[in-house]
Amino acid sequence: MLPLVALVGRPNVGKSTLFNALTLTRDALVHDQPGVTRDRHYGVCRIDGQPLFAVVDTGGMVGKEDGLAGATARQARLAVAEADVVLFVVNVREGASALDDDILAWLRKLSQPTLLVINKIDGVSDTTVHSEFAHYGFSDVVPVSAAHRQGLDDLIEQVLAWLPERSIGEAFNEDSERIHIAFVGRPNVGKSTLVNRLLGEERMIVSDVPGTTRDSITVDLERDELRYRLVDTAGLRRKSKVEEAVEKFSAFKTLQAIEQCQVAVLLLDAGEGVTDQDATVLAAILDAGKALVVAMNKWDGLATYQREQAEDLLSRKLGFVNWAEVVRLSAKHGSGLRELFRAIHRAHVSALRQFSTSEVNKALEIAYQTAPPPSIRGHVSKLRYVHPAGSNPPTFIVHGTRLKVLPDTYKRYLENFFRKRFKLVGTPVRFLFREGDNPYEGRKNVLSERQIQRRRRLMRHVKRK
């Protein structure tokens, strides 16, 4: 399971800015006005695409208006109860306040490890930073400037040292032979019905009321001599619709299931098409870099013209993930299930494929010769060599020069070329671009004695002229 880190503190200390900096997103609303964040929401801290831990941002706890027993404080308490490590965020420019003292007193009653994060240190002397909160008696203090990303590496290092020794990979090590599949989508599209149909029993509660499934439920299945682990998740809804505390936790469990799976099945309602909520779920899958199968449920209930409309809408809304296979099925009646498992298997094989350095360099050479990078303001990027850097998703590191000006269109060309050449289906393909250092930079050419004598003769000849 992905470890969880909670950000707690009074309003306007920079928790949301720190959340955005750790997750490399702008998911948390940032404003100088205190109290902008009311609810808690989740993200994932990654390095080079690899997830390290989940982060939960909470609303600022206001003393007079809410009190520690108010609605915002309840959200903070729930976040802390879920968390493995708590980051107590304070503002060095405003110094310690009575509300900071109250929050600290509450945190000290809990069992979770707590780090003191002193934010907004830019422009503040080191003496002030270390003395302002010294009376709190923390042994682990990390000064940062979230807005300028100062001190974040030290913070991440401290957090990792405090987290329990577990990782996403442990979920697979329990049964590495099983294909881990997460069924995700917005509420009431038929995820539980589909899992029940696959299992041949009423394992999941099924209802017409959206949100019946509140937690991620894991079951094992063997089919066609292959072993699977199925995860039925709670539906991800728009943030404005997620109100109950238990439902917020369900959303986090769904994000965890996406992080831990090997193949994500995005279930859509064929009659309603692709909605904004579906796009939100898809974004979480793509952000995690997981293999993807799109399943159009309730296909049997559509007339011919409705199916044509659904196909047209799908191609327009999801054209940017045309590498994912689309399966038309009916969870209620069981049609299309064999095609679903075939698509899952193809996506899984593609996502975990291993590549040799020689074959990917041959592919890069052919791609480069077929369509060289365009000239940008008189500069042309040069791609020297590539090597595989991992799987699930397949990742390649390209080395060269002037790669910062390499257009996004050419990067997509490389992705499509590699996908077609290696017959990769149902999985993202990632490229990382590294500009090589000049190996001769800073080195002085050492002349031999013969070269020195020759240079002297030339210089005397020049002077006589």
UniProtKB/Swiss-Prot annotation:
Domain of life from the UniProt record: Bacteria
GO terms for MF: ATP hydrolysis activity; GTP binding; ribosome binding
Function description: GTPase that plays an essential role in the late steps of ribosome biogenesis.
Positions of GTP 1 binding: 9-16, 57-61, 119-122
Protein residues bound to GTP 2: 185-192, 232-236, 297-300
Taxonomic classification: Bacteria, Pseudomonadati, Pseudomonadota, Gammaproteobacteria, Lysobacterales
Keyword set, alphabetical order: GTP-binding, Nucleotide-binding, Repeat, Ribosome biogenesis
SMART domains cross-referenced by the UniProt entry: AAA
PROSITE patterns the UniProt entry points to: G_ENGA
Annotated signal sequence range: none
Subunit structure: Associates with the 50S ribosomal subunit.
Name of the featured protein: GTPase Der
Domain spans labelled EngA-type G: 3-167, 179-352
Keyword Repeat among record annotations: yes
Residues in KH-like domain copies: 353-437
Coiled coil start-end: none
InterPro entries: AAA+_ATPase, G_ENGA, GTP-bd, GTPase_Der, KH_dom-like, KH_dom-like_a/b, P-loop_NTPase, Small_GTP-bd
Family listed: Belongs to the TRAFAC class TrmE-Era-EngA-EngB-Septin-like GTPase superfamily. EngA (Der) GTPase family.
GO biological process entries: ribosome biogenesis
PANTHER family, per the entry: GTPASE DER
